[in-house]
Amino acid sequence: MSVLEVKQLCVAYKRTPVLHGIDLPTISPGQVVALVGPNGAGKSTLLRTLAGLLPATGDIRLGSLDLLRCNRRERAAVLGFMPQTLPDGIALSVLETLLGALRGGDPLAAQGSARQKQQKASDVLEQLGILHLALRPLDGLSGGQRQMVSLAQAVIRQPRLLLLDEPTSALDLRYQNDVMSMVRQLADQGRIVVVVLHDLGLAARWADRILVLERGRLHAAGTPEQTLTPALLEQVYRVQARVERCSQGRVQIHVDGSVS
């Protein structure tokens, strides 16, 4: 079983430290882990570092694979990353974009005839409910549609580690829950999923574990019940709030006011 281990992770930007010796609890396959925290806490920086996109010191291991020091092909074979936004100026269709993502990863994942690869891409699009967009140019899509295509790119190679940066940010309420339900299914198939979320209600409903970041440090880690408390919300977000746990795992956070 390939667990994810992160020890003493440090990142600096122009010699200014932004992540300070982060040690994460061991994360096992089948778990959805949400990274939460206020703006500037280091959530996206941590996720991009896990994806191998930022230089860092420390240790990141997925099973026996050293993710900080392995080569790009080794990393691409096990890891899927969804950025906050896709770059503009991509003239390819959605289907062509997915086929490119398939070719860019594990050589074994890219094996098969052109028809088999197209079928694999179509299956992912259908699973996400966006098969009707297959032939549309990426630049002609709405923000929410582009978000769904970005998720499709991240999952098409069936990675063992899936890193998602705000996958629900441009989606309406229906699609937010659809996407998080899909994320849950991907984890249940034996993957590790680490997802940045601003919506604490979504984090509480869908995550097995929540990691709370503040100013580049790990402030708290545990289950939603252990972490999303009025005391923590006051300490980290500087708000006075009440946490109400409703039916079907839903959580409502009522903010009464800010703390000066």
Which residue stretches match the model-derived regions?
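A short, flexible loop at the N-terminus of ABC-type nucleotide-binding domains that lies
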Residues: M1-V6, C10-I27, R69-N71, G89
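Helix-to-loop junction immediately C-terminal to a conserved catalytic motif
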Residues: A51
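Conserved ABC ATPase signature
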Residues: P137-L141
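The feature captures the beta-strand-to-loop junction immediately N-terminal to the Walker
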Residues: V36-P38
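Conserved ABC transporter NBD signature motif
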Residues: G58-D66
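Catalytic Walker B motif of ABC-type/P-loop ATPase nucleotide-binding domains
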Residues: L162-E166
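Conserved ABC ATPase "signature" region
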Residues: L99, A114-L133
